[in-house]
Amino acid sequence: MSEGLFFIIETFIKAVVILAVIACLAGLATYAERKVLAYMQRRIGPDMVGPVGVLQIVADMIKLFTKEDIVPANANRFIFLIAPLISAIAAFAALAPIPFLPEFELFGHTIRPILADINVGVLYVMGVASVCVFSPLMAGLASYNKFALIAAARAVMGLISFEVVSGLALLSVIMITGSLSLIDINNYQKGIFGWFVFKQPLAFVLFLMASFVECNRTPFCLTENETEIVAGYGTEYSGMRWAMFFIGEYANMIASSIVITLIFLGGFNSFWFVPGGLMMIFKASCVFFFFLWTRAAWPHLRPDQLMALCWKILLPLALVNVLITGIALI
């Protein structure tokens, strides 16, 4: 088999496998979240469908697939229908330059678990993540619903504001490594004390907080509040279109967990006798669990509180961190 044909087949298989695995993990994440919240709140959680309730995911899928797809009479039909797709597509597209595991040999060929090894991987992920802002905006505007419109405005406000913070947080890491490639940043962190969580702790905290906003997670979730704006920009959605928002949200959480692991927690570098692949899965799982834990442990912030936190505290801290990093590198 020629190298060109093998590359095409390999890329196609990797794309299918990555999409299938992340889609399955996004479904499993809903079950994991319900179980984690249940144990933290002294409840049992899903336990009726299958062993320990694990088949609840299948039951939810059947329910969502069989629900009627309703479009409000006054809604802009075309925009209303495509808005949920943008959320899921952008979340999956962000996975392209992410190396999930170390490379390995198979049938005499070196397999790299990454779709596109581009030298501007960080910039690509940031750019695609910013596209996610169009999904709630379009859903809110097209729904012809005041709750959805308010939620869309909140989502745009939060996402645009924290994109600045996350960009500045990553800038300090890029200044040290001199590369925008996620693989180069991962390879730079040799040894546990080489992790950027120790070299750039402030950048880590800032990027983590920005990830909460981009993933629409508590305590920085502005788009859903049953006492204020009901289900936010998803109020008028039903069936699988409603589910697409959550598939995108959980896929975003998984992607964010992997990116945080790669950039700040040593990525897939081996640790003592533990292989790099297992370390990658373990660290990303811990970050993902933190996303779930905060929902049960922290209250929501008001929009004005979140904006004050972003522009008055986090942004100045990010600028100071970049300045100090630059001075240290001179």
From Swiss-Prot:
Class of this enzyme: translocase
Chief location bin: membrane
Catalytic activity: a quinone + NADH + 5 H(+)(in) = a quinol + NAD(+) + 4 H(+)(out)
HAMAP family, per the entry: NDH1_NuoH
Location within or outside the cell: Cell inner membrane
Enzyme Commission numbers on file: 7.1.1.-
GO molecular function: NADH dehydrogenase activity; oxidoreductase activity, acting on NAD(P)H, quinone or similar compound as acceptor; quinone binding
Origin: domain of life: Bacteria
Protein family membership: Belongs to the complex I subunit 1 family.
PANTHER family to which the protein is assigned, alphabetical: NADH DEHYDROGENASE SUBUNIT 1, NADH-UBIQUINONE OXIDOREDUCTASE CHAIN 1
Role summary: NDH-1 shuttles electrons from NADH, via FMN and iron-sulfur (Fe-S) centers, to quinones in the respiratory chain. The immediate electron acceptor for the enzyme in this species is believed to be ubiquinone. Couples the redox reaction to proton translocation (for every two electrons transferred, four hydrogen ions are translocated across the cytoplasmic membrane), and thus conserves the redox energy in a proton gradient. This subunit may bind ubiquinone.
Name used for this protein in its record: NADH-quinone oxidoreductase subunit H
Key words of the record: Cell inner membrane, Cell membrane, Membrane, NAD, Quinone, Translocase, Transmembrane, Transmembrane helix, Ubiquinone
Assembly with partners or alone: NDH-1 is composed of 14 different subunits. Subunits NuoA, H, J, K, L, M, N constitute the membrane sector of the complex.
